[in-house]
Amino acid sequence: MPNINDMTVGSPTRDIIKFAVPLIGGYILQQMYLIIDAAIVGQFIGVNALAAVGASSSIMFLIMGFCNGSCAGFAIPVAQEFGAKEYSKMRAYVANALRIVAVIAVVITAVTAIFCEHILKLVNTPDDIFHDAYLFLLLNFLAIPFTMSYNILAGFIRSLGDSKQPFYFLIAASLLNIALDFILIIGLGMGVEGAGIATMTAQAFASALCWTYIRKHLRILIPTGGERAYDDKKTCLLYTSPSPRDRSLSR
């Protein structure tokens, strides 16, 4: 089966290095969304718009750290069952993890969107940039389902030993984000709202690439029949898997 790397055989050191390099690159690229937005906004709109994006960045880093860490943790049992060659159990974990992620994404999106204004007031956002900061942050909050979708699907792909494909997908999404920034901010004059829409679209694109790749090349991950059923024990294990990681990433 293509692009499945059995990391239980061969040199552990070599496999870890080969796996880790694209993984680290991927985390850097995910942070680049905000950096790219800030650079283009600051260059072509002005200081206030740049400050608005900057005011949102620390908030987004905190929330995205939690989301990313959770999704990475949910992929751990999937990787363990793949290594044990228990493929039916692996797919059952995939199904239950997707349910949990869907619930978390909806809840976090709803809560952050509703309290977006209060969050900005809590961090003492200046009045002259408040409107732009609100628009940018709200659009990023609304993109949380796409972000979590990418992270969980990328986690499943990495569970099979392939950290390169998710990295390539992030490169493509980052290029799309840059292109949309220029089109929406400069071409259409949409300001920070354009930057937020560009980021949301890029994250949705990365998620779609992961899903398409799994459908075409990694059907071993797709649950069928009884594997889709809700499982209390597996759900509890999935809930406990990400705890230390998501806390560390959201500090």
Regions found by a protein language model. Name each.
Residues 41-61, 127-132, 192-193, 236-238:
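Interfacial/gating helices of multi-pass transporter permease domains
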Residues 1-20, 78-143, 187-238:
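Short alpha-helical transmembrane segments in multi-pass integral membrane proteins
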Residues 23, 27, 39, 76, ...:
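Transmembrane alpha-helix boundary and packing residues in multipass membrane permease domains
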Residues 101, 156-179, 193, 197-200:
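Alpha-helical transmembrane segments of multi-pass membrane transporters/permeases
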Residues 24, 28, 32, 36, ...:
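Generic alpha-helical transmembrane segments of integral inner-membrane proteins
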Residues 13-32, 59, 63, 142:
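Residue-level signal for short hydrophobic patches within transmembrane helices
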Residues 239-246:
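Conserved small/polar residues in nucleotide/adenosyl-binding loops
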Residues 50-110, 147-166:
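Small-residue-rich hydrophobic transmembrane alpha-helices
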